[in-house]
């Protein structure tokens, strides 16, 4: 076929077709039928315009031999065959000079006599099927469509064929000749069958045998065959009479399609109630680290050794007291638990050799905090299916909570830069293939933008805590093991640093199923005074445990140091995902890559370097009540990363539901912005599905409030 194309068509046409295919990443040597189709289409476009001129009186005329004295202007502007950028430039300039409406898709020709764009189609199938597909795709009254087939049939908008008989006959004869030539070489059948529908992604594979019979049996009334039904569906014009068409189809269907206009959508209703509270497994912006630089002590890298070394850097310990009690808990037990940790760490130091792990004594306060013997005994269903009053124990409906400002502050903080680097370059994974040169360049640029980001610190902290907790849960099932919360980073000068955020004590952990829960008590250092936003700390009991000297611009100031204590729980599956939080880096890198790809395809070259190094350019980050927020490419990287990290830290069924359902509304709104005139049915049901996920989760509530900002600005 490739040889045939090169013999049969003018070299200029062949060259243009090759260029067009390369632009879309296709290979003329492999996709030979497509190669032939593009050449045929180009030739028809050129023949359509050949010999047609407009004379000085503005009349259309046909001139076959060139008369050098005639003042003639080409009747048709050829758009097909130019590269995309040039083609759009031509279309724009035509629209500007003639006032014709700009088409959504690139047409093939412009007719200066009739003042309209023309879409030329060449099909190996039925002309009316192809015509319907074209019309359905371009959805424009203004663009004229003219379809030719290889069998000599043609079809045009309003049966207006634009050209005279003879010019059209020339085109039909040429198409017939191409068909004969292909047939004589045994190429026609494959070429005829290879035609895809207009821009429809799914392959039209043939349905045969039983499936075909079933398909024919299950057609709606009034359709004789599957082909007949397909043609009807392809030409389905959403122009207000959908309801009528639906009612023909089935007695069961009674959806009313409502047009979706700028005034249609309302904001999402966020719940009322007390403000939502912090529910992450560890503190985020409020965390405080005790750190050692360039650790070189004995046993460096063993968590317990590192933790003791970090504890020794602080000298301001004092007698702990409760500053914000937990509403429901036995607060003195939390206080006793912290005192026990201090005492047992002291005991370790008095021993000759520090052990690698530390199991806490099973005191009454720890048994209480870790819910020892509290959970109802789990019994195998087989052993109790005969029990008459078997039931699931009651659980309360969750209480609705309102959005609180702290979660937006948490998110803003997560996007900020810290003064340490939390990942090395290879954290995102190595190249697999040599072709990955561009990929590694992108990865390195991206890593440079996010390595100092606070969200990256949260990733490493999350990975560490979940790994340590899962290890201990498997290795010391019955023990109340003390697990230091540690992270490692590098300072600006490249010095290594080990940080201690606090401790976890894990409860009994006989985890048979993925969802079996292990309880733990977390105790985390902080300088945040809980009395500023008490609602955020509903689940915590907070102690004041020391005073810390801080260097500030005005000299040294002493600030109280707090310990945030709470009981919490997690499961094997949650810890497994927590250990894989580095995936967030990959997810946000891929989002950035798709932005670069989009730029590169417009500019027809790889834009990675310009993308990251052009510091003056700003990019859209997201909607806020103030409007569209913009920022540097680094800010975009960090914001995308923070979103991905928060999806992991605040993962919940509410988030799953909200993401899935709100996406549907988002797509409709985007269709409206793109002037695609969307229609909807049961919009109320969609709102209900979205709003039933807005209960009490801070991250979901924040996303819903962002969604409302987006709606406001999108529909202005």
From Swiss-Prot:
GO terms for molecular function: endonuclease activity; metal ion binding; RNA binding. Disulfide bonds: none annotated. One of its GO terms (biological process) is viral RNA genome replication. It comes from Influenza A virus (strain A/Chicken/Hong Kong/715.5/2001 H5N1 genotype E). Influenza RNA polymerase is composed of three subunits: PB1, PB2 and PA. Interacts (via C-terminus) with PB1 (via N-terminus). Plays an essential role in viral RNA transcription and replication by forming the heterotrimeric polymerase complex together with PB1 and PB2 subunits. The complex transcribes viral mRNAs by using a unique mechanism called cap-snatching. It consists in the hijacking and cleavage of host capped pre-mRNAs. These short capped RNAs are then used as primers for viral mRNAs. The PB2 subunit is responsible for the binding of the 5' cap of cellular pre-mRNAs which are subsequently cleaved after 10-13 nucleotides by the PA subunit that carries the endonuclease activity. The gene is PA. Phosphorylated on serines and threonines by host kinases, including human casein kinase II. InterPro entries: INFV_PA, PA/PA-X, PA/PA-X_sf. Keywords: Cap snatching, Endonuclease, Eukaryotic host gene expression shutoff by virus, Eukaryotic host transcription shutoff by virus, Host cytoplasm, Host gene expression shutoff by virus, Host nucleus, Host-virus interaction, Hydrolase, Inhibition of host RNA polymerase II by virus, Manganese, Metal-binding, Nuclease, Phosphoprotein. This is Polymerase acidic protein. Binds 2 manganese ions per subunit. It is found in: Host cytoplasm; Host nucleus. A motif (Nuclear localization signal 1 (NLS1)) lies at residues 124-139. HAMAP family: INFV_PA. Its cofactor is Mn(2+). Mn(2+) 2 binds at residues 80, 108. Its EC number is 3.1.-.-. The lineage of its organism: Viruses, Riboviria, Orthornavirae, Negarnaviricota, Polyploviricotina.
């Amino acid at each position: 076929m490739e040889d045939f194309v090169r013999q049969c068509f003018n070299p200029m046409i062949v060259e243009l077709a090759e260029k067009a295919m390369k632009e879309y990443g296709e290979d003329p040597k492999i996709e030979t039928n497509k190669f032939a189709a593009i050449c045929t289409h180009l030739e028809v476009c050129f023949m359509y315009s050949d010999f047609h001129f407009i004379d000085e009186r503005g009349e259309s005329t046909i001139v076959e031999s060139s008369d050098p004295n005639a003042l003639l202007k080409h009747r048709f502007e050829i758009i097909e065959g130019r590269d995309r950028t040039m083609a759009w430039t031509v279309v724009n300039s035509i629209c500007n000079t003639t006032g014709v409406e700009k088409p959504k898709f690139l047409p093939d020709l412009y007719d200066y006599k009739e003042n309209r764009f023309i879409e030329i189609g060449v099909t190996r199938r039925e002309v009316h099927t192809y015509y319907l597909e074209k019309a359905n795709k371009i959805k424009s009254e203004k663009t004229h469509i003219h379809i030719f087939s290889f069998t000599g049939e043609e079809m045009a908008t309003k049966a207006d064929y634009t050209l005279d008989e003879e010019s059209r006959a020339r085109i039909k004869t040429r198409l017939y000749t191409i068909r004969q030539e292909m047939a004589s070489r045994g190429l026609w059948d494959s070429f005829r069958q290879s035609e895809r529908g207009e821009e429809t992604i799914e392959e039209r594979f043939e349905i045969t045998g039983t499936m075909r019979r079933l398909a024919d049996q299950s057609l709606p009334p009034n359709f004789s065959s599957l082909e007949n039904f397909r043609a009807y569906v392809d030409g389905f014009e959403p122009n207000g009479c959908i309801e009528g068409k639906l009612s023909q189809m089935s007695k069961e269907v009674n959806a009313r399609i409502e047009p979706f206009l700028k005034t249609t959508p309302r904001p999402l209703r966020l719940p009322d109630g007390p403000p939502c509270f912090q529910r992450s497994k560890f503190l985020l912006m409020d965390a405080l680290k005790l750190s050692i630089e360039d650790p070189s002590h004995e046993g460096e890298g063993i968590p317990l050794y590192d933790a003791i070394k970090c504890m020794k850097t602080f000298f301001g310990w004092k007698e702990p007291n409760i500053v914000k009690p937990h509403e429901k808990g036995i607060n003195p037990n939390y206080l006793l638990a912290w005192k026990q940790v201090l005492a047992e760490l002291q005991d370790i130091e008095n021993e000759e050799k520090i052990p690698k792990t530390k199991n806490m004594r099973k005191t009454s306060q720890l048994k209480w905090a870790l819910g020892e013997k509290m959970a109802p005994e789990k019994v195998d269903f087989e052993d109790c299916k005969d029990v008459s009053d078997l039931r699931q124990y009651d659980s309360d409906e969750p209480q609705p909570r309102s959005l609180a400002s702290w979660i937006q502050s948490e998110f803003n903080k997560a996007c900020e830069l810290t003064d340490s680097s939390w990942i090395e370059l290879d954290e995102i994974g190595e190249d697999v293939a040599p072709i990955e040169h561009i990929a590694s360049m992108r990865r390195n640029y991206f890593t440079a933008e996010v390595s100092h980001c606070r969200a990256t610190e949260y990733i490493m902290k999350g990975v560490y805590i979940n790994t340590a907790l899962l290890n201990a849960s498997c290795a010391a099932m019955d023990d109340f093991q003390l697990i230091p919360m540690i992270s490692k980073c590098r300072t600006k000068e490249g010095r290594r640093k080990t940080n201690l955020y606090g401790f976890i004590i894990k409860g009994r952990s006989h985890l048979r199923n993925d969802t079996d829960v292990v309880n733990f008590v977390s105790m985390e250092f902080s300088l945040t005074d809980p009395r500023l936003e008490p609602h955020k700390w509903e689940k915590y009991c907070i102690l004041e445990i020391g005073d810390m000297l801080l260097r500030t611009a005005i000299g040294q100031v002493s600030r109280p140091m707090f310990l945030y204590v709470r009981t919490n729980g997690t499961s094997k599956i949650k810890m497994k995902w927590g250990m894989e939080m580095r995936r967030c880096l990959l997810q946000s890198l891929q989002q950035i890559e798709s932005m670069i790809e989009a730029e590169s395809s417009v500019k027809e070259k790889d834009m990675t370097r310009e993308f990251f190094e052009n510091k003056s350019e700003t990019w859209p980050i997201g909607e806020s009540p103030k409007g569209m927020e913009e920022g540097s490419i680094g800010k975009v990287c960090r914001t995308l990363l923070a979103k991905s990290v928060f999806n992991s830290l605040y993962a919940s069924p509410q988030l799953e539901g909200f993401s899935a359902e709100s996406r549907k509304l988002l797509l409709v709104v985007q269709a409206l912005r793109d002037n695609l005139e969307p229609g909807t049915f049961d919009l109320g049901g969609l709102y209900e599905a979205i709003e039933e996920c807005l209960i009490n989760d801070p991250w979901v509530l924040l996303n819903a409030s962002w969604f409302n900002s987006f709606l406001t600005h999108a529909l202005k």
